[in-house]
């Protein structure tokens, strides 16, 4: 298992059907293949890491520092640079291409993207406040947040107080999203459930940090298929037994009739 991640764009949502009788909502992500730009060793910084570049960028949009960095490299400039720490740096070389194959044996991933911006919102929408009373002395402040401070001491509003403000448009991470399937030919990955952001949102994927002992839908599907096969075998054996019993009954009846 590797700690290297990938970058993609959210295409949209769909639905996958399984023989168990379950339909699962999935998010489809188009993966951008990465390329190893630089290798960082313990001699340089005290740890082993790999710098991976994603996406195309015009040379005119590069900063002077990035132009100097890429002038020493044999690879073409990339729009995004991500650094991933690895255990065995000998497995990587500059210019190596990295794609969906790194998630071949991975069941769950962590996804980071920017949520949809919802503009300026009040506390009832933003934080699910109940608001003030509909009557009984309340006038023109039914949806307000109420008191935000105390009195002369401390004489200020503390930082982090839940108040009206800009809602959404923030970087959010979803943990342990199940990989339903991956299409290596078209660089598509299907994740269970939804992820933050609208269509064409930039998405960062990485191996799940929290390890969970949870059966995936595919594993559950296999278990159900095995159970169905066992039931089929049991039904076949029952039919065979019933046919044999009936045959023996007929034989006994025939013998009795002959004696009579």
Would you name each region that the model predicts?
Residues 1-260:
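Extended basic (Lys/Arg/His-rich) segments that typically form rRNA-contacting surfaces
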């Amino acid at each position: 298992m590797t700690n290297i991640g990938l970058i993609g764009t959210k295409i949209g949502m769909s639905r996958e059907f399984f023989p168990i009788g379950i339909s699962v909502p999935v998010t489809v992500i188009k993966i951008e293949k990465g390329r190893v730009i630089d290798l960082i060793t313990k001699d340089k910084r005290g740890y082993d890491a790999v710098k991976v570049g994603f996406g195309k960028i015009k040379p005119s949009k590069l900063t002077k520092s990035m132009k100097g960095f890429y002038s020493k490299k044999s690879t073409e400039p990339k729009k995004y640079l991500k650094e991933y720490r690895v255990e065995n740096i000998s497995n990587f070389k500059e210019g190596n291409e990295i794609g969906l194959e790194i998630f071949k044996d991975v069941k769950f991933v962590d996804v980071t993207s920017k949520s949809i911006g919802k503009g300026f919102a009040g506390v009832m929408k933003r934080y699910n406040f109940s608001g003030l009373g509909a009557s009984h002395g309340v006038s023109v402040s039914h949806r307000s947040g109420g008191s935000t401070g105390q009195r002369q001491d401390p004489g200020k509003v503390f930082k982090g107080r839940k108040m009206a403000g800009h809602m959404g448009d923030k970087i959010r991470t979803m943990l342990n999203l199940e990989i339903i399937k991956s299409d290596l030919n078209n660089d598509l990955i299907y994740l269970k459930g939804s992820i933050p952001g609208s269509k064409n949102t930039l998405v960062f994927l990485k191996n799940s940090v929290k390890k969970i002992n949870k059966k995936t839908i595919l594993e559950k599907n296999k278990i159900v298929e095995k159970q169905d096969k066992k039931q089929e075998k049991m039904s076949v054996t029952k039919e065979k037994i019933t046919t044999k019993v009936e045959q023996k009954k007929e034989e006994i009846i025939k013998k009795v009739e002959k004696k009579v």
